[in-house]
Amino acid sequence: MGKIQKKHGKGRLDHYYRLAKEKGYRARSSFKIIQINQKYGKFLEKSKVVIDLCAAPGSWCQVASQLCPVNSLIIGCDIVPIKPLPNVITFQSDITTDHCRQQLRQYMKTWKADTVMHDGAPNVGMAWAQDAFTQSELVLQSLKLAVEFLNKGGTFVTKVFRSKDYNNLMWVFQQFFEKVEATKPPSSRNVSAEIFVVCLKFKAPKKIDPRLLDAKYVFEEVSQGNNNNEAKVFNPEVKRRKREGYEEGEYLQHKRLSILDFITDSTPIDNLGETNEMTWTPRSIKEGEVDEEEEKEKDKEARDERGNVQYVLDDKVYSDEDALKMVSKLPQTTPELLECLKDLKVLGRKEFRAILKWRLSARDLLQIDKPEAGVEVEEEELDEDQLIDKELSELGEREKARKKRERRRRNEMKQREIQRMQMNMTTPTELGIEAAKMESLFNLKQAERTGKLSELQKGKRSHVSETGDEHVTLEEAERVDYGSDDEANGLEDELESMYTEYLENKAARTAKSVVQRKKANVETEEWFGISDKKDGDESDGEMSADDVDMATIDDGEDEDDGKTARTLNNGNMFFSNPIFDNLVNAAVAKTEAKPKALDLLEPGAKDLIELEKAKKRKYAKKNGLEYSDSEDEEDDIVMETQKQDDSDIEYVHGESDSDDEPNIDLVTDQAMTMAHQLATGQTNKHKLQDDGYNRYSFRDLDGLPQWFQDDENKHNKLNKPITKEAVEALKQKMKTLNARPIKKVLEAKGRKKMRALRRLEQMKKKSELINEDGARSEKEKADDISKLMRKLAKPQKSKKKTVTVVYAGGKNKGIAGRPRGVTGKYKMVDGTMKKEQRAIRRIKKKMGKK
């Protein structure tokens, strides 16, 4: 017998058909949802609840059961029965009925679906237009169920046929989902009209317009209106193609219109947009156009027996020919206008406007817009209640307008304030106004009320007050009271305290400053001296006005004492640094020889020098040494009277060879340059002394605020030149310092070395025992010693063996034996074991408390 050839209608037995047979899928459409899932972020792997509408024969449910997480809820329904599938709930129902909705709610309880899929299609074969519309209705019903059961951020996948309702469906999808895309997977046949729409990120609106899910409203055919004649007239430069075709019966595509029809018609723009040419011929009434009602409405027009229109002007009757002659004699009827009327399709906006103005003039000439005579409008008088209501409504409207203006003004002010903040324009603009108390602003209305506008126009400089009774001259206006000295001092104190607080907050944030404060251990609180005024009975109570004045006077008297105390405290804090331990003696020795140098010191430094001399004497007496005030007279180091923030020499506090000499280290480019010049002989002691006297050395900063002094010391200082050799030397020094390992690394290396030495000692002892063993030959002894040497050289491995922990879930759930891909020791764990271990620890903790 010959082999039976099976028909391959529409290529059904293609590559995907054979793959579906091999993999056990019920239909080749399984690959469609697989490819869509891979293209759009694998949404099935993240879905706990999946609904498949029109699921027969169940191929999409098969894919969902394989890709969704374990213990996921998968529900499939169709109008035809579906064979049972593992881990899938199936039932038979029509998705357009309430029974399907009730069944879904019964299975899902209070859950929400993460993904809703729809791959249904109606029975086709009758008519293509009817089949496409039925498919669109089916898609809308599936969307209705998806909107009801989908969770926020869910996904909806549906099949749609390409038809005229496609755009309507896409618009509805976009109302419910943030992202809507149409795709055609490779497994879908090219001859098929199906496409798949993937809707991502469901919005879950609280209120849904029922019309969006109504097929009558969504697929309603909207009648196309007239052509956009306004665009043709007012924007004729833009040419639009006629994709909709042409009107029925219009074979020549060249429309002509009588000028009288254009003048009398109420839609002139439509006439200009649809007409090609206007003629000077009388218009004729078509058959069936005239009726009795129209005759009654148009009293100003009359028709003769032939049907031509007759115009009644000033009790005289004119025909179409007469009306055309009257219109042609208008001044606006120019030769240019006549040429424009011959071809309207080539005109621009300017020409169309001229034609419309000419039409209005013609209507006025023919008295078409003239109101009917004898018709008077009677105004009804309003009673008292109506007048009150009208007045109240007007007041309400005015109040609304006022509130609207006020709201607009506030919004504008807020916008300006936001703009000022964005541009960092944070300086208060009202300071000048408050200082002058609004009197420095010139107001033209106030000047007009005072009657002094003429004097201002003549150039007289005077000030106009609000009342007009006071006349302030320029000299008096310039004498402005800016406050007393006490207020200025209070402002300075406030600024000083704010700056001190700023420095404290800034220093508290840096770790270096914390370490410096711990090392220095110096009190930073300033002492402003003791006032002579007696704080007696009213120290705890409130002060009166007289007491405040007296306190202000006392503060002024004690101002010099407070300054002296502050200066003394600052000097003590400055010279308490260990840097001056050796330098004080030099200053004391030079005091007798150079008394002027001692005067350069800050107030309070003299007392500090005497204190240091006493310390030196005590130290010399304790160690049995002789101390002389002129011992350090020839010291090469010169003290600078000006305190600088950025010192070139860093004094390291730590262990040193002598208790009297600090440990000095060179850490800056300028310090290294100075040391290099001293070492090479480029400079000497006397030149350094001369360089110490410069324009920054004799600045008088007494009485100036601290923030100003800090700013001066930061910017106004001597910039000493540096050399390339000094920079390279400093870089090499820092490189050497950075190359040194830290203390912990050195300790670890030392411990490692000690362990190696101990192992070496042990090996020596074992080697001696081996050599002393007479029962062994020399070869055996050499082999044993070699083994010991290799063992010593071999790095020690950790004896702890690794154990692989495998979770007994997912693909390893219920597995017998070793899991796939696991080598070595392993341990199976699951949630129950974790709970048991937690319970054991809890019981031990309770037993320990008892």
Curated annotation (Swiss-Prot):
Annotated binding of S-adenosyl-L-methionine, by residue: 58, 60, 78, 94, 119
Coiled-coil region: 397-425, 746-773
Enzyme Commission code: 2.1.1.-
GO MF assignments: rRNA (guanine) methyltransferase activity; rRNA (guanosine-2'-O-)-methyltransferase activity; rRNA (uridine-2'-O-)-methyltransferase activity
Chain residue ranges for the region called Disordered: 273-305, 388-414, 529-569, 620-646, 811-850
UniProtKB keywords: Coiled coil, Methyltransferase, Nucleus, Ribosome biogenesis, rRNA processing, S-adenosyl-L-methionine, Transferase
Subunit field text: Component of the nucleolar and nucleoplasmic pre-60S ribosomal particle.
Name recorded for this polypeptide: AdoMet-dependent rRNA methyltransferase SPB1
Organism for this UniProt entry: Yarrowia lipolytica (strain CLIB 122 / E 150) (Yeast)
Gene that this sequence comes from: SPB1
